[in-house]
Amino acid sequence: IPRFLGALLDYYKDPAALSADTAFTLLDAIRYLPQQYYGEKTRGALIEFAAYFVAQGELRLTIAALEFLREAQRSLPKGHPQMGRIVAIVRSMQPEALTAIFLKYKILSRAGVKDPALEQTLYHMDITSEVFLDNLKTATPWIVKVAGVELLRDQVEHGLDAHILHIAAHFSNLVKVSERVVVRHTAGDALVRTLSLLRRDQRNEVVVELGKGLEMGQYEISKYIPQYLGQAALYLHPSELDEQVLWLRGLLASPSDSAVSGALNTIGVLLENYPAYLERFPQPYSAFEHRRQELLGLLLQGLAHYREAVRQEALLVIGKLLFESRELSLGEKSRLFALCYRKLLFLILESADQSRLTFFYRAAALAHINRFIALHRLDHGPFSFPPPRKIAFFPGTFDPFTLSHKGIVQAIRDLGFEVYLAVDEFSWSKKAQPHLIRRQIVNLSVAGDFHVHLFPDDIPVNIANPDDLHRLSQLFPDQELYIVAGSDVVANASCYKAPPRPWSIHGMNHVIFRRAGEKPLPKKLPIT
């Protein structure tokens, strides 16, 4: 490091010989140079380097120099000689730009020096529209825009809330349209910090407006939105948040891969920051947990998608934003893992046909999950999973799979069953549709429903064959196994009319649902 530092500091010896672009790069670089690697003498030389460009008057260089001087102040006590030199430098300047005035005021305030004229300009005059105008100009340097965002945020934090909604909307626009990544990130952070100060209706308006950037489906616009849309949505009241979740569900059906990718990333950020929502908006834990499961289910739907690009993005989000997250505690990750580990395993294996790129996406996601599992086992020992549920087996899943069929599956699941759906290879009594397409339709339909799974394709089960039923029962040892069938099947299928044999269908537990139009039973029959 000393050799590198010495080579770098050689460039700061003659500021007059530098071009404007080189000087700006050097000024911006020293802000991020760790101060423990150089002493007071070097710091003094860098302060004089910045002083030269403060005096030059070019706004871009002035702002960069002031940002460094502000950073250098952080490690200096008020009585330090270098602190006095910094104060002398900024007092000698006569800035006209509001961003330069703002930085001058901040530097003097940190040094304990009051300047009523600067305070009058910043906090007793309406300067918001002028900052808006500068921030939206293409010709404005990005470092000036960053300082402008900080100025607007400072205005709000000082209680100047006359334009607070317009300021939040301005931050939202910068996240969507700014050509500089650093401006987008600065505006996004400022937006999230500002939302808590808005009224309920204002928060909803800003979040909805920010979400419109995802609907456009343009990657250049939507790339950085999810990181802040996900955090911002968690400042909405529960009813408005549920509307946002419903909107994201609809966006997952978009024909644009960019829009779907943005929706998946937003859902990932929502899940990553979701634990804080319960403290922000107290509510019944059941409602809080139901919303978490719904969000996780939407991610799993992405894994079951028929478009490969969507499956790739879902793998990335699950691996990186959930199991590699620095925001989620190990306990939160464990709860998510216990809920979805079966779904993850099945959905990853179900889409066996893959491109080379998908192979690497899958490898990266599994590496993140494996790292989480290893850390959990080291710190907390083996996983603790809920006790096994009763098994409900659909021997021939409906074709085509409709919402009413899905409702039957969910009703049985809600009775405490783990539901397995088997898709027939071919049945003359059903629609003659290719088997893999039928299986994919069912898979996509139930991907987001927990405790509902497709039965493995390589284990054929014929309910008329006692050997198949015996093997099926052996797949679920120490668990109650139920066959699910419609009342018309029980009344008319040949296997039920055949004489009973060992392990025939007659000796199996059943869950029977009544077909529409049939007479109701004289009394309800219990599940035994």
Q: Where do the model's predicted regions map?
A:
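Residue-level signature of the C-terminal ends
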Residues: F4-A7, Y11, P15, A29-E40, ...
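Alpha-solenoid HEAT/Armadillo-like helical repeat scaffolds in large eukaryotic proteins
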Residues: A7-P15, F49-Q56, A88-M93, I101-L108, ...
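Conserved hydrophobic register position within alpha-solenoid helical repeats
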Residues: I1, T22, L26, L46, ...
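Short sequence/structural elements of tandem HEAT/ARM alpha-solenoid repeats
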Residues: R3-G6, G39-E48, K78-R85, D126-I127, ...
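Extended amphipathic alpha-helical coiled-coil/heptad-repeat regions
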Residues: Y123, E150, L160-H163, F171-E243, ...
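Nucleotidyltransferase catalytic core that binds NTPs
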Residues: P226, L264, G268, Y274-T528
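Alpha-helix N-cap/helix-start positions at coil->helix boundaries
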Residues: A17-A20, L59, P95, A111-G112, ...
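Generic N-terminal leader segments that precede the first folded domain
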Residues: L59, I63, V90-T99, L103, ...
